[in-house]
Amino acid sequence: MPIFGQDDFDTEVLLEGCQLAGLQVIEYTPRRADANSVIPTLRGRFPEAVIVAGSTIDDENVIRQMQQKFPQLMSIAQLAPFVDGFVSMLPYSDATLQAYSPTHLCIPTAQTGGEALRQVGKGAAFIKVLGPDFSFSKNLHATPTFGYCPTYITGGVTRERMPEAFAAGNVLCAAGFDVVLKGENPETITPERVAALLCAFVESAKAARAAVNPQLSRLEELTDEEFLAVLPNYCSVI
């Protein structure tokens, strides 16, 4: 999953590249200054894709104050009509998970096992873990946890590190365009080049995940019942 964060690349070039690549999911964050104008348009541009808002904060008082400095910030309530899910580098409260998990994918961060268990139990679809170190992922997937926790990892997950990321137990990974397009010139890159590099990332991720969880390599062919049966983790989205 590509993450629209803060970088020097042109938004329109990146969006066109995502369209050419036929991506099934994208994450757009308010770290990008145009987020409050772009996020409401994404469903129209990507009608078949899952649209996720990243870098969310589930405290409206904090959002209101920080909007003075970062006017592109939107609360979860403001984002909800335009997206299919939310990601955060922070935990979510029980109230947020109970309010939004029935209708949206909720992917908060945890930094302890207890924090992860609480949030999954309240409806989190995945727990976000922060790379590039995989120690916490491995702890969450240790034998005594019975592999309950579905984890999504970001941060330094290059194509070369994907096998290690999935071997640590993660079932999803994402990267910002600073990683996906590393070494590319923002002034000259084309949508076609963006699409080619995105497709290479997607194929590397699929291959790395299939090596660890081969039962997940043909998800589009499974019924809902078969899908739930092959998942390696607990599923709160039922």
Task: List each language-model region with its residue ranges.
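Glycine-rich phosphate-binding active-site loops on the catalytic face of alpha/beta enzymes
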Residues: 79-95, 129-138, 169-197
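Catalytic beta/alpha-barrel core
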Residues: 2-4, 24-33, 50-58, 65-92, ...
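Surface-exposed amphipathic alpha-helices with a cationic face
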Residues: 19, 39-46, 93-103, 120, ...
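Acidic (Asp/Glu)-rich catalytic clusters
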Residues: 13-20, 36-47, 76-81, 98-101, ...
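Conserved N-terminal beta1-alpha1 strand-loop-helix module at the mouth
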Residues: 1-65, 159, 188-206, 225-238
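Catalytic cores of alpha/beta
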Residues: 60-81, 114-123, 139, 157-173, ...
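C-terminal helical cap(s) of enzyme catalytic domains, especially alpha/beta-barrels
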Residues: 97-105, 146, 166, 181-237
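Short, well-ordered alpha-helical microsegments
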Residues: 11, 35-39, 93-97, 113-117, ...
